[in-house]
Amino acid sequence: FSEISQFDRYIRPAVYTKLHDKVQEILNVTIEELTCIGHDFTDVANDFIRWCGDDYIFCTWGQTDLTELQRNFDYYNIEYNFPMPFLFYDVQKLYSICFQDSKERTTLKNAIEHLGMQELEGYHSAGSDARYTSQIMPELDFEKVRKFYSVDTYRIPQNIKEEIYLDFGNYGKYISRGFADREEAANDKEVTACRCFKCNKTMKRIIKWFSTNSKSYYGLFSCQEHGLIKGRFRIKSTDDKQYYAIRILKCTDEEGGKKIKMRQQREKEHRRAKRLGTPE
């Protein structure tokens, strides 16, 4: 990796015209300074889109930046043509795969300190955080993490043909189209399908999908070729109140299967106690 150019601009506040004292302390800038030196968001956004060009991929620290970017674009009616599905690299996740347990999420500052890098500027400003993130990327085993894209879901599939299927080797991810309500999403045939993410063959249901709340569902299946597969899907909502599912199917073993069974048993006991009005 090598730097080609930088894009770093201050935005003139238009919607929120006050800064909390803590935010001002972290950013080391006042609202008066932002008003004075900041630029109009629409101008900066269009310059940024032109700066990106046609051949790019976003690399962020965390998963929320691109959602907020598009939310602001829509608020200001700025035209943009990001790809669909919108794949990007969450460097925080890639760092965890390379240096942690793949599940933990550490701060940018902790990652920089762990790698023994110089801290020549502060944190929490867009420019400095982007520079620190770019310094971490060459330290990753990129051949190991290259396939682990993240998917931004600010925009979701609009129909069955656009639904997203990704295979990451030991697990597969599916993102559904939008539905009118949670129940419709949770009961959709494709959302609850039990086809192996590797061979696409129908699996045997060992534990049917069950919910632990109105958002999360779990299941356990067996593929004749690929063995035990555990499943989880969550129902989420978009800004315009569409409901969609993100489903993960992952290879597991007997121990992983036992954990799913234990989770199901705990949920049954919880519901039984709730019906009877007895303490758990």
Regions found by a protein language model. Name each.
Residues N81-Y95:
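Conserved beta-strand -> loop -> alpha-helix junction used to position metal-binding or nucleic-acid-contacting
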Residues V29, I78, M117, K201-M203, ...:
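Short aromatic/hydrophobic-glycine micro-motifs
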Residues F1, E79-F82:
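Short, conserved catalytic or adaptor-binding loops enriched in Gly and charged residues
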